[in-house]
């Protein structure tokens, strides 16, 4: 078994079964099951879902959406990524898998916007994201132009 790596998840019934493992692990707002079911096309490779398999099982996942323009108050001009629903199964937490997913997104070299959920602000701070508070809630933003050295070859997946 090789070292786990981040890969784009196919939208298919196998992935749907893998997502069911996450259903009881986190908050309802992290659930991707319904989102996947609504978009199921067998082996669609253009999915917004990314994950890490370990021993043949999905152990961590996130969704990434390309957006056109962030504008105020996010100080994002041009296209950016929205990172949603980052989740690692409890047995595999605190082992760097969440960081691997975020570093995969950072390698795309677009600004990244995310919402800190469930006491995760320390995680985002550690990964050089900056907090932004707006009426809609608290967000975290990462800018590649100010963080060009934030992802090293050793950290990248």
Swiss-Prot record:
Gene Ontology MF term list: acyltransferase activity, transferring groups other than amino-acyl groups
Record's keyword annotation contains Acyltransferase: yes
Top-level taxon in the UniProt lineage: Bacteria
Residues annotated as domain N-acetyltransferase: 9-154
Pfam families to which the protein is assigned, alphabetical: Acetyltransf_1
EC annotation from Swiss-Prot or TrEMBL: 2.3.1.-
Keywords, comma-separated and alphabetical: Acyltransferase, Transferase
Name of this protein: Uncharacterized N-acetyltransferase BCG9842_B1219
């Amino acid at each position: 078994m090789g070292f786990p790596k981040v890969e784009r998840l196919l939208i298919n019934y196998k992935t749907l079964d893998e997502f069911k493992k996450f259903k009881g692990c986190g908050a309802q707002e992290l659930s991707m099951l319904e989102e996947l079911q609504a978009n199921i096309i067998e082996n669609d490779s253009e999915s917004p879902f990314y994950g890490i398999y370990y021993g043949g099982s999905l152990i961590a996942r996130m969704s990434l959406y390309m957006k056109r323009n962030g504008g105020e108050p996010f100080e994002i001009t041009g296209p950016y990524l929205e990172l949603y629903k980052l989740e690692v199964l409890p047995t595999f937490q605190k082992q760097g898998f969440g960081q691997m997913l975020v570093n995969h997104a950072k390698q795309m070299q677009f600004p990244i916007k995310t919402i800190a959920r469930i006491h995760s602000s320390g995680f985002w701070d550690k990964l050089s994201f900056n907090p932004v508070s707006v009426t809609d809630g608290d967000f975290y933003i990462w800018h590649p132009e100010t963080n060009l050295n934030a992802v090293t070859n050793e950290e990248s997946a």
